[in-house]
Amino acid sequence: MYIVQIASECAPVIKAGGLGDVVYGLSRELEIRGNCVELILPKYDCMRYDHVWGLHEAYLNLWVPWFGAAIHCTVYCGWVHGRVCFFIEPHSEDNFFNRGCYYGCDDDDMRFAFFSKAALEFLHQSNKRPDIIHCHDWQTGLIPVMLYEIYKYHGMDTQRVCYTIHNFKHQGIGGVKTLWATGLNREAYYFQDDKLRDDHNPFALNYMKGGIVYSNAVTTVSPNHALEAQYTDVGCGLGHTLYLHKEKFSGVLNGIDYDFWNPEIDRHIPDNYSQDDFEQKLYNKKALRERLLLQAADKPIIAYIGRLDNQKGVHLVHHAIYHALNKGAQFVLLGSATEAGINAHFRHEKQFLNSNPDVHLELGFNEELSHLIYAGADMIVVPSNYEPCGLTQMIGLKYGTVPIVRGVGGLVNTVFDRDYDQNLPPEKRNGYVFYQSDNQALESAMNRAIDLWYQSPEQFQQLAIQGMKYDYSWNNPGTEYLNIYEWIKYKW
């Protein structure tokens, strides 16, 4: 099958968040299975060119219709860790992708409307006719709209679109100007409720809504998040639209890269280990204590790795630190905050706890240290208020670090409570789950984990090993997406 992925990110060359990892990981898995996979990306001035091999001009004269005229673009081709990537560079005074950033500009709606138009125009003019076009997030939400309303009348009538939503909070809001620019000329038609009109602002267009309405299949990043998006405010106003299109909407759990996150081969940890020689994990625990100057004591280490913000349940992260200490555990935090108030709070906590030999707060992000924490900690807490998929708990499971999570989003699909899960036998359970976003619920889950560590160390080790047996690689998501591709290829 010939598949083209169109996105605003692809790790490691363009990475602002988890989207880039997903686009790369899924593309690689699909290619390993014998499919032809190509990626189309913006050519940002600030992307990591050192990760692109053999970058060269592949298409010199791409003219993209825009506001009734046309913008000249050059399309470059290169290989990103074996993946064929095309990078679109427009030559105009707008300098759409020469801003020193990926996102955050006042005209982001127009920047990515242009990118979507240019990607389709490139496929059209170069005579590329993929079986599947897979688009990601609001930045490419207009692609299925333009494919159906414009390009299907120009020889692109057999292409099918899968549209994946990674983050409902950012939906891409434009206006009449978007229609004029892209050639979607029937203003009254597109401003209907069942087309692109935003559900909050009747004078605005919603790119993500367009992607949902016009795509052949719509996915999000976990089955439980798909339900949340339809029936709760997690959909950020798109719940009704998703419900109307529920026959083509599903959740597919993301995967993690086991070539990078794997204690058996991890080059960032002093001692590699597996479920068969789990005792080697203790050497990493010792190394973690030495590096972070924690006291050598017969205590469990509880970790938190991630952003420090409201989405991640920052109030519960703070409480987890002190509750761990009160329960005779050690605590390690590796996190960063963009909000000034949260950042100042944790800097104060770091100073206050500086002399405590059972806690270390590392503010910022350190890739190498994160690997050592996963390998050295006994438990990892993920108290998110909102978690579409979640990678932290998957990585923790692979490293035999028992997750303590709040039951939201993808956390529900990956962590199964040792004591209370009624759907799985005890040998399939792998962690601890709490549901309310309050201190008492968190404490209850932490207490159960810490008590098991102290009172039944063999059972705790068995729980950790059970978690290591789960496969959260890209293998299963790859199969699910290929099934979706086959379904839309032959159904529509």
From Swiss-Prot:
<comment type="function">
    <text>Synthesizes alpha-1,4-glucan chains using ADP-glucose.</text>
</comment>
<dbReference type="Pfam" id="PF08323">
    <property type="entry name" value="Glyco_transf_5"/>
</dbReference>
<keyword id="KW-0328">Glycosyltransferase</keyword>
<comment type="pathway">
    <text>Glycan biosynthesis; glycogen biosynthesis.</text>
</comment>
<feature type="binding site">
    <location>
        <position position="15"/>
    </location>
    <ligand>
        <name>ADP-alpha-D-glucose</name>
    </ligand>
</feature>
<keyword id="KW-0808">Transferase</keyword>
<dbReference type="GO" id="GO:0009011">
    <property type="term" value="F:alpha-1,4-glucan glucosyltransferase (ADP-glucose donor) activity"/>
</dbReference>
<dbReference type="Pfam" id="PF00534">
    <property type="entry name" value="Glycos_transf_1"/>
</dbReference>
<dbReference type="GO" id="GO:0005978">
    <property type="term" value="P:glycogen biosynthetic process"/>
</dbReference>
<dbReference type="InterPro" id="IPR001296">
    <property type="entry name" value="Glyco_trans_1"/>
</dbReference>
<dbReference type="InterPro" id="IPR011835">
    <property type="entry name" value="GS/SS"/>
</dbReference>
<dbReference type="GO" id="GO:0004373">
    <property type="term" value="F:alpha-1,4-glucan glucosyltransferase (UDP-glucose donor) activity"/>
</dbReference>
<keyword id="KW-0320">Glycogen biosynthesis</keyword>
<protein>
    <recommendedName>
        <fullName>Probable glycogen synthase 2</fullName>
        <ecNumber>2.4.1.21</ecNumber>
    </recommendedName>
</protein>
<comment type="similarity">
    <text>Belongs to the glycosyltransferase 1 family. Bacterial/plant glycogen synthase subfamily.</text>
</comment>
<dbReference type="InterPro" id="IPR013534">
    <property type="entry name" value="Starch_synth_cat_dom"/>
</dbReference>
